[in-house]
A protein has these predicted regions:
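NAD(P)-dependent aldehyde/semialdehyde dehydrogenase
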Residues: 257-373
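Short, ordered loop/turn segments at secondary-structure junctions
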Residues: 152-154, 180, 205, 236-238, ...
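Conserved small/polar residues in nucleotide/adenosyl-binding loops
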Residues: 374-381
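Short acidic loop-to-helix transition motifs that present clustered carboxylates
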Residues: 103-104, 154-158, 178-186, 329
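N-terminal Rossmann-like NAD(P)+-binding subdomain of aldehyde/semialdehyde dehydrogenases
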Residues: 1-115
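Conserved small-residue-rich beta-alpha loop and adjacent elements
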Residues: 99-165
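Conserved NAD(P)+-binding/catalytic subdomain of aldehyde/semialdehyde dehydrogenases
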Residues: 169-258
Length: 383
């Protein structure tokens, strides 16, 4: 038995952690002293935004009126799927109960929603509409009374109109023109007239993730989410073109987004090694820059001898998103243990789960899938 790296990444997801931690610690200390004014100055510095922080009800109504109907329909479709899945999770995940342990001794469990949830919605390179659906909808279904949304504003515009519409549709009580570490600090400390968040949820870049990590304890967090990850398990029956496309589709999220292929097929591996750079070269400027750096620095192709070896490698990596494109899907379904979200069958791509199949895309990264709850996306979602 042998595991061979046909392409091994020169970097890991922890390469820049020390520098990131130092930057975030300094920002958080500064905001503790400067409060709202410090947040505004950082928003001006990083986002070139100098407008109001709180999105007014009038602005929300204006966006709802002017946003194109196709975008609204797509958002509502995603919201309905995610809401239904969240309701099913709430119903089946845990129930209130009381039990008599001995004569006269009663013990029980009661699920009580937090009062305030702070939902972070990334909008640095792209407006992550789906992140608003995933975080706000789930908090609303859980019964959270006060939901605050923060997202990076654009100069002269504020939060992306589609994110404002989505957050309002899904049940946000307050929407703030604030992104980055300053947004996490503002929600944690109850700035701009809001109650302090009891929990922070939602993905973000390495600085947002580090801010959540440093503030954990003062505030609850969903998980420590780093850059998005994809791993594809493929055998000789897989379509190598589809494998290559799926790897690039996640790598383009950011310059430090790992993309991994685990396979027994040298033919599949060689095809992907040749094809991925070609696909990257055909992308528009920003996605090409992101995916090129991600594949160069974090991409890996690992050749194994057996299915068991592949499963062991996959469980060791515990990828955020894991696709299985093999002839023995059921074996992998039963064998694999560590992942954030599992996508079974070649027609079940990560994009479905990330956008609108219903399962949540706020998932563990950097190996945290070994101790986190997992989701399963079956081929029927592609129909």
């Amino acid at each position: 038995m042998a595991i061979t790296y046909l392409k091994r990444s020169p970097k890991t997801s922890s390469t820049d952690d020390t520098k990131t931690r130092e930057i975030v610690e300094n920002i958080l200390k500064d905001i503790e002293k400067t409060k709202e004014e410090g947040c505004k100055e950082l928003s001006k510095k990083f986002d070139k935004y100098e407008g109001d922080v709180i999105v007014s009800k009038e602005k929300i109504e204006e966006i709802k009126k002017n946003l194109d109907q196709k975008t609204k329909d797509d958002i509502q479709f995603s919201h309905e799927r995610v809401r239904k899945f969240a309701e099913a999770q709430l119903k089946n995940y845990g129930q209130d109960f009381e039990v008599e342990l001995s004569d006269g001794l009663f013990a029980g469990q009661k699920l009580i929603p937090v009062n305030t949830a702070g939902c972070y919605v990334p909008a640095g390179r792209y407006a992550h509409i789906a992140s608003a659906v995933m975080s706000v909808t789930t908090a609303k279904v859980a019964g959270v009374k006060n939901i605050i949304v923060c997202s990076s504003p654009k100069p002269g515009v504020g939060v992306h109109p589609s994110i404002v519409y989505t957050a309002d549709l899904c049940g946000a009580d307050v929407i703030m023109n604030l992104g980055g570490v300053q947004a996490i600090a503002a929600m944690t400390n109850g700035l701009f007239g809001n109650a302090p968040a009891d929990i922070l949820v939602g993905p973000g870049n390495q600085f947002v993730a580090e801010a959540k990590r440093l503030l954990f304890g003062k505030v609850g967090i969903d998980l420590f989410a780093g850059p998005t990850e994809i791993a594809v398990i493929a055998d000789e029956t897989a379509d190598p073109e589809m494998v290559a496309y799926d790897l690039v589709g996640q790598a383009e999220h950011g310059y430090n987004s790992p993309a991994w292929l685990f396979t027994k097929s040298k033919k599949i591996a060689d095809y992907v090694l040749q094809r991925v750079p070609e696909l990257i070269e055909d992308l528009p400027d920003l996605p090409r820059e992101n995916s090129g750096a991600a594949w160069r620095d974090y991409g890996e192709v690992i050749l194994c001898d057996t299915d068991e070896e592949i499963a062991k490698v996959s469980d060791d990596y515990a990828p955020e998103h894991l696709e299985v494109q093999t002839k023995n899907l059921q074996w992998y379904h039963d064998r694999l243990k560590n992942y954030g979200s599992l996508f079974i069958g070649e027609e079940t791509t990560v994009a479905y789960g990330d956008k609108c199949s219903g399962t949540n895309h706020i998932l563990p990264t950097k190996g945290a899938g070994t101790v986190s709850y997992t989701h399963l996306t079956l081929p029927t979602t592609s129909s």
